[in-house]
Regions:
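Nucleotide/phosphate-binding sheet-loop regions of phosphoryl- and nucleotidyl-transfer enzymes
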Residues: 1-390, 417, 423-426, 433-438, ...
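Short beta->alpha connector loops at strand-helix junctions that form conserved
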Residues: 41, 449-451, 470-473, 561, ...
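Flexible inter-domain linker/hinge segments
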Residues: 209, 378-410, 524-539, 546-549
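Structural motif
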Residues: 239, 409, 426-428, 447, ...
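Extended, non-globular alpha-helical segments
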Residues: 395-435, 486-524
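A short, small-residue-rich loop immediately preceding and capping a beta-strand
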Residues: 444-450, 468, 830
Length: 876
């Protein structure tokens, strides 16, 4: 029996998502529920994988199954594909397993040609509608399938409207549209080396299926997948569906609706529609639509039926639904439903409401929230004082919440470049398209002239947590000249504007923003998450302010305090430079004694902010050359302070130069060559702990972490210095406290010898930033130059510095954990690289059995939620 590559909607269900894609599985499920669905069939994701494996060809077997399904659809609809009197027309849409809005391309009205369009005009008795459908098909097919730029066609439409003296597409007559079709076909031919527009509907269909498969690998899809951790080998399914028409006159229309508000989560239908339009007009945001409540006046029966079925869908899926619908001459059809994309704020509101309504459990609520999206909750709002003097120059649709201020840029590329220069960017576009994804990602905010709350800009911005205001029709924009005018002002590239994505207001100038405060739903979801998770979550912090912030966000301690960051203060850096450039141990010790009070006060402030929570203190790690002066004035000041000549200081600085400093004289190697550094740091740690215990009665157990260890003897050497100094301090103070000495596992050799190192270390913390660098053999600072080529060539799927490489680096982590605990059963294990705040890496840490993850303060909620999700998935 040959493999089944094609499924009718009547043959699938919601559980077949991996095979049929999200859209195909939902269309099958809606068919099973008895909803009014235009019938059709799905070409599976496996067929997409086969297409790539077969050298980008569709095999005869798959093509045969597509044509068999087409025969069934013809019988079902009572129409023939390519018929000259009453042709069957279909839409061809992509549908991957994971929702990827605007990443894949849609083709409508497929099956029309020069002859069948006349039969279609006769059958419908509506020539204008028939020719409008044909011109749309030529335009979409040329753009999506043959890559003839859409702008070529838009330009011709504008020229024709000018010639005919009309403003809107809808004012063009059937004769005008015939003329337009002729011009469109000419453009097609000119761009396709003289080839004519294909007239055989079967050729059209197979080309369209191939185009959807190809679009799985277009640059914007690759970028979206990398940003959202979607594997490249999943492939996309293709849905072929009988057409229904929303552009057959005033009793037809098309719309997009959500069963709850996707920005706030408020209960109640939220959406919009256009009378006499096709679906892509709403989604692409080409015309600005009406709110869904108006449908009750325009078509009350359709509205009542729609409301009933929308609630049926939400109750069935037990989640907020995003639905596309078309009304053809008074009859309602659903074209798709899916769990709606939503802001983080809305996700929390909806999850809590669904628990209160008894539709889902707290466990399900926790699993439903995308951990990464919590980032959005910590988004800025405008400073209330600054806002008082803000001048509103316009307002439009509040498409994605948050406040943003920045310089205006008019293209995605310019936005990206400006962002790389360090500018805050507001991307201003007539409308955004999927090609703009990287520019949108680089922007603080997005402002569009066209498009509604469900346009491409709105959906993508909400998904990324970027502030967006859409559909500001008052703007007069010239993207070529890089200028727009609004509210009586003219803005050029580089001028400042501010946007409020929660109200839709647009302000002149650069208004100060402030960090967000989180709401009650956040606390509720976090309370559930904390109940379910096993992993502890700590933070990486070097200042009391960072520490307080992280504790507010739920951090249970500090997993990495980088002591060197405390030395970069302008008051302190001369003292560390003096220590570095001193020739004798005595001079070094004298300089270190000047630093001791600063370091001790810092630790005291951190301990107080932590109120007894644990803190892991990493001893001095960076290469010494990072501290030496480079500015002329600093060199002179240091020379004067040390009683040396400028030339002597310069020479000493030059001697510290290393060819490969990241693998040079740093980490524990500093403590081996200059034990006095470790002595000073130990004295500061222990004295601070004793004094805070006396002042605040906190029971502090310092965790002292020695970095860059590659050998047990290395650790033993530094640990002896620490133990001797700690004993000396405690003897002086006559107060004795517990402390632990551990190490960072960041050199592959340390992972290989973890069983030996655990004889000395009381805890391991995986420094996955350096462990990744040393395992891959490339530097974090330089890898960006070539990694993009690796993504394009599908060598790597994601940035190994952002998402832990479980195949390589992960194996070292797992091995070190197992070997370490074989030696010391109670060995505490944590991770303190940037990976500590990445959800998939947190899940890995849970599986390997680490005790905690540590991440930057604002990622603490993400890690808490990801840890709970990992525990719940394991139970399931």
């Amino acid at each position: 029996m040959s493999q089944k590559w094609v499924y009718k909607f009547t043959e699938g269900n919601a559980n077949m998502r991996n095979l049929l894609g999200g859209k195909g599985a939902n269309l099958a499920e809606m068919t099973n529920l008895g909803l009014p669905i235009p019938q059709g069939f799905t070409v599976t994701t496996e067929a997409c994988t086969d297409y790539y494996n077969s050298g980008k060809k569709i095999t005869e077997e798959i093509q045969g199954q597509i044509f068999d399904a087409l025969k069934w659809l013809e019988a079902e609809q009572g129409k023939q594909f390519g018929d000259v009197n009453d042709p069957l027309l279909v839409s061809v849409r992509s549908g991957a397993r994971a929702s990827m809005p605007g990443m894949m391309d849609t083709i409508l009205n497929l099956g029309l040609n020069d002859i069948s369009v006349e039969g279609f005009a006769k059958k419908t008795g509506n020539p204008r509608f028939a020719y409008d459908s044909y011109r749309r098909f030529i335009q979409m097919f040329s753009d999506v399938v043959m890559e003839v730029p859409k702008s070529f066609f838009e330009k011709i439409i504008d020229e024709l409207k000018e010639e005919k003296g009309v403003h809107f597409d809808t004012e063009l007559t059937a004769e005008d549209l015939k003329e337009l079709i002729g011009r469109f076909k000419k453009i097609y031919s000119e761009n396709m080396d003289g080839a004519e527009f294909p007239q055989d509907p079967r050729v059209q269909l197979m080309e369209a299926v191939k185009a959807v498969f190809r679009s799985w690998d277009n640059p914007r899809a690759i970028v979206y997948r990398r940003m959202n951790d979607i594997p490249g080998d999943w492939g996309t399914a293709v849905n072929v569906q009988a057409m229904v028409f929303g552009n057959m006159g005033d009793t037809s229309g098309t719309g997009v609706a959500f069963t709850r508000n996707p920005s706030t989560g408020a209960k109640g239908i939220f959406g919009e529609y256009l009378i006499n339009a096709q679906g892509e007009d709403v989604v692409a945001g080409v015309r600005t639509p009406q709110p869904i409540s108006r449908l009750a006046e325009d078509m009350p029966e359709c509205y009542a039926q729609f409301m009933e079925l929308a609630m049926k869908l939400e109750n069935h899926y037990r989640d907020m639904q995003d639905m596309e619908f078309t009304i053809q001459e008074g009859k309602l059809y659903f074209l798709q439903t899916r769990n709606g994309k939503r802001t983080a704020q809305a996700a929390l509101q909806i999850a809590c409401d669904l628990v209160d309504e008894g539709k889902i459990t707290p466990q399900e609520a926790v699993l439903r929230i995308e951990a990464k999206s919590l980032d959005q909750l910590l988004h800025p709002t405008f400073d209330p004082e600054a806002l008082k003097s803000g001048e509103v120059i316009g307002s439009a649709l509040p498409a994605s919440p948050g406040a943003a201020a920045g310089r205006v840029y008019f293209s995605a590329d310019e936005a990206k470049m400006a962002h790389m220069r360090g500018d805050r960017v507001i991307l201003v576009r007539l409308e955004t398209s999927p090609e703009d994804i990287e520019g949108m990602h680089a922007s603080e905010g997005i402002l569009t002239v066209r498009g509604g709350m469900t346009s491409h800009a709105a959906v993508v911005a909400r998904g990324m947590g970027t502030c967006c205001v859409s559909g500001c029709g008052e703007i007069k924009i010239d993207e070529e000249a890089k200028v727009f005018s609004l509210g009586g002002y003219t803005f050029h590239e580089g001028d400042y504007i501010s946007l409020d994505g929660s109200t839709g207001k647009i302000y002149k100038g650069d208004i100060k923003t402030v960090e967000a405060s989180v709401s009650g739903n956040f606390g509720r979801i976090m309370m559930w998450a904390d109940k379910f998770r096993k992993l502890q979550v700590r933070t990486n912090a070097d200042t009391p302010a960072d520490t307080e912030n992280a504790v507010k966000l739920g951090a249970e301690g500090i997993g990495l305090c980088r002591t060197e960051h405390m030395f970069f203060d302008p008051e302190r850096i001369p003292k560390i430079r003096k220590m570095i450039l001193s020739d004798t141990q005595e001079a070094r010790e004298a300089a270190l004694m000047e630093l001791l009070p600063y370091q001790k006060e810092d630790f005291k402030a951190m301990y107080k902010a932590l109120k007894g929570r644990p803190m892991t203190i990493r001893y001095l790690d960076p290469p010494l050359h990072e501290f030496v002066p480079t500015e002329e004035a600093d060199i002179e000041a240091l020379a004067k302070d040390m009683g040396l000549t400028k030339e002597q200081v310069q020479q000493k600085c030059n001697e510290l130069h290393e060819f490969n400093p990241m693998m040079g004289h740093r980490g524990c190697r500093l403590a081996v060559t200059f034990p006095e550094i470790a002595k000073m740091q130990t004295r500061a740690v222990i004295e601070a702990a004793i004094e805070v215990k006396e002042e605040c009665d906190y029971d502090i157990v310092p965790e002292i972490m020695i970095p860059l260890v590659g050998d047990k003897k290395e650790l033993k050497f530094v640990k002896t210095v620490v133990d001797d100094t700690a004993k000396q301090v405690m003897d002086e103070k006559k107060i004795y406290i517990n402390y632990h000495v551990g190490t960072m596992i960041e050199i592959p050799r340390a992972a290989l010898l973890a069983d030996e190192i655990a004889e000395e270390a009381e805890f391991f913390s995986f420094g996955t930033n350096d462990l990744t660098q040393m395992t891959f053999g490339f530097s974090r600072d330089d890898a960006g130059k070539f990694l993009s080529s690796y993504y394009e060539s599908k060598i790597y799927e994601s940035d190994p510095f952002a998402k832990l490489d479980q195949n390589g680096v992960g194996k070292l982590v797992k091995m070190a954990a197992e070997k370490g605990r074989a030696t010391r059963k109670d060995l505490k294990l944590g991770i303190c690289g940037e990976h500590g705040g990445d959800p998939s890496s947190v899940e890995f840490c849970h599986q390997v059995g680490l005790n905690y993850v540590s991440c930057s303060p604002f990622r603490v909620p993400i890690a808490r939620l990801a840890a709970a999700q990992a525990a719940l998935k394991e139970q399931a």
